[in-house]
A protein has these predicted regions:
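Enriched for short, Lys/Arg-rich terminal
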Residues: 70-114
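Basic, Lys/Arg-enriched alpha-helical interface segments
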Residues: 1-66, 87, 112
């Protein structure tokens, strides 16, 4: 069974900023291909989202947040998400943030669900 994937408003803002940054610094076709891959990775969370590890930030946040990595080397981005289970094999995945691996992780106040 597939999970439903929702993208939080802050994650949409993150994605817009990332897309703008990559478009400014890369050829258009390369940027589009990379961004399409990012969206595909987010979409892959429909199936077995618990395959992704619990983020180290979960302890500080006091709730489970998982992490999916996209890209490689210096182009790696962290996709932070939570899982709301309706049953063990069904529920909602909520993408909370997307950050470059070298940036400071989002703080507790940034993980508030909207």
């Amino acid at each position: 069974m597939a999970f439903r994937v929702e993208i939080a408003p802050q994650a949409f803002d993150d994605l817009d900023s990332i897309a703008d940054y990559i478009k400014e610094r890369s050829r258009s076709a390369l940027a589009e291909r990379w961004f399409s891959g990012l969206i595909d990775d987010i979409d892959s969370l429909k199936n077995m989202p618990a395959r992704c590890p619990v983020a180290a930030e979960s302890e500080e946040l006091g709730r489970e947040v998982r992490l999916l990595l996209h890209g490689r080397k210096t182009r790696t981005y962290k996709i932070y998400f939570s899982i709301d289970y309706e049953t063990p094999s069904r529920g909602t995945v909520r993408v909370l943030h997307v950050r470059h691996w070298a940036r400071k992780p989002p703080g507790k106040d940034e993980f508030q669900e909207h």
